[in-house]
Amino acid sequence: MELKDYYAIMGVKPTDDLKTIKTAYRRLARKYHPDVSKEPDAEARFKEVAEAWEVLSDEQRRAEYDQMWQHRNDPQFNRQFHHSDGQSFNAEDFDDIFSSIFGQHARQSRQRPATRGHDIEIEVAVFLEETLTEHKRTISYNLPVYNAFGMIEQEIPKTLNVKIPAGVGNGQRIRLKGQGTPGENGGPNGDLWLVIHIAPHPLFDIVGQDLEIVVPVSPWEAALGAKVTVPTLKESILLTIPPGSQAGQRLRVKGKGLVSKKQTGDLYAVLKIVMPPKPDENTAALWQQLADAQSSFDPRKDWGKA
């Protein structure tokens, strides 16, 4: 049985750090991957590189491998390690060979530590109306299963029924403890993080905790004042347009914005004056009467002035 030179296989030095070894592994794994490589021995080389990475990527295993390499010419090492001529050593034999050469205590001391599972992050779209109250949502996602090389081996579908609290905001993260990937060697599971994405609304724009809505009004409604029906997230309200209102003017409706634990925002109605279509002869005459009555009014009087 031959103790392979894993450093030579990876093309690195024993003094190189994990980052350098990882870079070499990724390069060689891409080069010899059976699905893309045209090398005749690609599959064998790929397995050899993966085997070297499995040992050298683990701090404890690497230290033990270095110790084995250092003692490879000792008589005790040769008696234990070369018991089966013609067979090649691989990473799966590591535990048994190490404990045979260095004793049971060494095997116990090198057990891999408990490792926490990976966190998973998924985006959840929420409508503005749904932010007003707590609601239930069914979440489906794939739970990745990693192999010894840290690569995803398969994905297991998983479904959860979760509660989305009232008042969630865009970009808010909700933690579901232990719903990520399983831990290793008794380590805790990772977490599932729900990242809230507030879906765009056809009528409302979000400004902090407040909402803005553009309200179309006619010229005479703006001039004379009026009451118009305006939608909110809960219901429609009757909004008072004061006489002499201007285009772009913002009218505040208290308490009709977004809801959070700390405060409730307001709704701002932004007035947009909409002209009627091309006037007929009678309508044009009325506009002309208005123009004559307001002949002293100059809308550009202060134009360009600071």
UniProtKB/Swiss-Prot annotation:
SMART domains: DnaJ. GO terms for cellular component: cytoplasm; nucleoid. Transmembrane segments: none annotated. Keywords: Chaperone, Cytoplasm, DNA-binding. It is found in: Cytoplasm, Nucleoid. Residues 5-69 form the J domain. One of its GO terms (biological process) is protein refolding. InterPro entries: DNA-bd_curved-DNA, DnaJ_C, DnaJ_domain, DnaJ_domain_CS, HSP40/DnaJ_pept-bd, J_dom_sf. GO terms for molecular function: bent DNA binding; unfolded protein binding. Disulfide bonds: none annotated. DNA-binding protein that preferentially recognizes a curved DNA sequence. It is probably a functional analog of DnaJ; displays overlapping activities with DnaJ, but functions under different conditions, probably acting as a molecular chaperone in an adaptive response to environmental stresses other than heat shock. Lacks autonomous chaperone activity; binds native substrates and targets them for recognition by DnaK. Its activity is inhibited by the binding of CbpM. This is Curved DNA-binding protein. The gene is cbpA.
